[in-house]
Amino acid sequence: MQNKLCSLRLGTYALLSFALFSSSVRAQTLKEVAKFDLPGPGGKRFDYLTIDEDDHYLISAHLAAEQTYVIDLRTNKVIATVSDTPGVEGVEYVPELKKFYTSNAHDNTIGVVDLKQMKVIKKLKTDAKPDGSAYAAPFHKLYVSDERGKAEAIIDVRKDEIIKTLHFDSETGMPQYDPVTRKVYVNLQDENIFAVIDPVADDVIGRYPVGKCKGNHGMTLAPEQHRAFLSCEGNDLMTVFDLDKHQAIVFLPMARGPDVIKFDVGLKRIYVACSSGAISVFQMDDPDHYRKLEDFLVQKKVHSLAVDVETHRVYAPEQEEDGKAVARMVVYEVVSR
């Protein structure tokens, strides 16, 4: 009888273990398909990425190495290393001019990079620690958050001149341009406020609280669904903000240390790079309903990622592997949809 009970228990344990394993496999959202070294020194922090969809280039800011890489997504090869970008944080591509702009935190400038020459052709002085940036194409304006300067610098990209600077009582987080409402949004992360800028006159026309979200630093948009997604670094929440009602409607927990957040419009999937060692993944079922799919494990100190909307691949730079210094880009494909 005792042997039968033992066998029964072992069988039950095996079934439970198999079920948990199967569930874990089914729940996985991403798989690593490639990784390649980058030319900068290992162990140095990376920051924002942006994709040039015309040329299939990934532009990667290597903040602590003070340089920026241009990577061909078709070959996963670095085709250029742009220097003179000290402390580069934000990078933003302007397609019609074949230029991209770097937010250089270490000399408080915005660098103008000509993609044909692959070099900095001009620098614009800002207040303090320029960070994230967003391009409002119909207005030919680039909006750059001067995080520690508590400001938003506005650049006319046709002249490459700062035409206005908006000042706030808060550090500024990531801005975004909404092509549906034709408005610019910016996180006021010290005050937990979502600000709205009219790019016609470049006036602030609204300020709205973000509910339980603390430290709304990162932002991405789902323009067709009239939603903004915020990464709240103060309390590790992914917050959904209704752009019509101007209020936060959903709060979901994510891994510690959230930073850059991106939305895959085709899959309706939200990714957040978390420096504790995970990419938190969420699914939009409809504009009012969301599910957390998983905290996909990656190396620690991953702060940034980019999503290729054509291939749905996710790109994330790593500065360490199990504590060992590296400098590389990791490529992930979607497993479950």
Which residues fall in each region the model found?
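Bacterial N-terminal signal peptides
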Residues: 11-21
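Predominantly soluble domains enriched in secretory-pathway, periplasmic, or organellar proteins
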Residues: 26-337
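Bacterial N-terminal signal peptides that target proteins for export
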Residues: 2-13
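Compositionally biased, low-structure terminal segments
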Residues: 1, 19-22, 291
